[in-house]
A protein has these predicted regions:
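A short beta-loop-alpha structural element at the N-terminal edge
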Residues: 2-16
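Conserved beta-strand in the GNAT
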Residues: 56, 62-71, 87, 92
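Conserved acetyl-CoA binding element of GNAT-fold acetyltransferases
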Residues: 79-95, 125, 147-150
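Conserved acetyl-CoA-binding loop-helix of GNAT-fold acetyltransferases
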Residues: 93, 99-112, 139
């Protein structure tokens, strides 16, 4: 297995992986999300963006996982320190390849991407119900930073 930056030629192989991530979200929070395919423009913008990348795990010529990253700059405010951090927007590994170090390799690649750009941190959001993901991130040394509350059925 190797980790590399995606190219436009990878778009078709990436579509089912992004769809798998969206499917997981829809299963965990069906009132908030629905299954869908990620549009090609979004995928290609991540690949070609000046402040973004899609990192892929490839095995035997097939993409088995992805990590979508982009830079976020927090503008200075009297109460806020200006900084740029890496947002890990999506990380997804095909089910057949989970628990084999693929996700950790992608997370490490995202971290290296952020460090190479001198980002202050690597941040992500995950659904509270996604216990597997939360365990994965905590085992990787990440910590919970913010909690979002929601009041539904208004």
């Amino acid at each position: 297995m190797r980790i590399r930056k995606a190219t436009i030629e990878d778009t078709e192989q990436l579509k089912p992986l992004f769809a798998g991530s969206l499917r997981n979200m829809a299963q965990l929070q069906p009132r908030q999300y629905r299954e869908a395919e990620q549009d090609v423009e979004f995928i290609q913008a991540g690949i070609l963006g000046e402040d973004s990348d899609v990192l892929v795990a490839e095995k035997d010529g097939h993409i088995i996982g992805l990590a979508s990253v982009f830079s976020v700059t927090v503008k200075p405010r009297p109460y806020r320190v200006q900084q740029t951090y890496c947002e890990l927007d999506t990380i997804f590994v095909q089910e057949a390849h989970r628990n084999q170090g693929v996700g950790k390799a992608l997370l490490d690649a995202a971290w290296n991407w952020a460090k190479a750009l001198n980002h202050a941190s690597l941040q992500l959001m995950t659904l509270g119900e996604n216990e597997d993901a939360r365990r994965f991130y905590e085992r990787a040394g990440m910590r919970e930073h913010k909690i979002v509350y929601i009041l539904e059925n208004l």
